[in-house]
Curated annotation (Swiss-Prot):
Keyword annotations: Chaperone, Coiled coil, Cytoplasm, Virulence
Source superkingdom: Bacteria
Domain notes: The N-terminal region is dispensable for binding and stabilizing SseB, but is essential for export of SseB to the surface of the bacterium.
Subcellular location: Cytoplasm
Assembly description: Binds to SseB and SseD.
Purpose of the protein: Functions as a type III secretion system (T3SS) chaperone, which is required for SseB and SseD accumulation and secretion. May have a direct role in secretion of SseB and SseD, or may facilitate their correct folding, for efficient secretion and function. Required for survival and replication within epithelial cells and macrophages.
Protein name as annotated: Type III secretion system chaperone SseA
Observed effect of gene inactivation: Mutant is severely attenuated in virulence.
NCBIfam families xrefs: PRK15365.1
Record flagged with keyword Coiled coil: yes
Length: 108
């Protein structure tokens, strides 16, 4: 039973670490998306900024902003799906009550 408990704890720790990594990526994604939106807003306000950022944005996003948004939506759906899977697995692990056999009372 102790080995099963250690394996469950190890799996729980791995899942928790994966959750933290996904959460970090999601935060970065939102930061990048906000910066791109800011650049687009600034570009719309000033013709000079428009010319300067046009080439930068084209180099970064050759498929255009619409293509980036489509890819971002796909990625976001994947992340949400992974979060849901992670949540289900964590609930399963939490539902498993660890059973320890008291020392000296083993079956033979």
């Amino acid at each position: 039973m102790m080995i099963k408990k250690k394996a469950a704890f190890s799996e729980y720790r791995d899942l928790e670490q994966s959750y933290m990594q996904l959460n970090h990526c999601l935060k970065k994604f939102h930061q990048i998306r906000a910066k791109v939106s800011q650049q687009l807003a600034e570009r719309a306000e000033s013709p000079k900024n428009s010319r300067e950022t046009e080439s930068i944005l084209h180099n970064l996003f050759p498929q255009g902003v619409a293509g980036v948004n489509q890819e971002a939506e796909k990625d976001l759906k994947k992340i949400v799906s992974l979060f849901k899977q992670l949540e289900v697995r964590l609930k399963q692990l939490n539902a498993q009550a660890p059973v320890e056999i008291p020392s000296g009372k083993t079956k033979r």
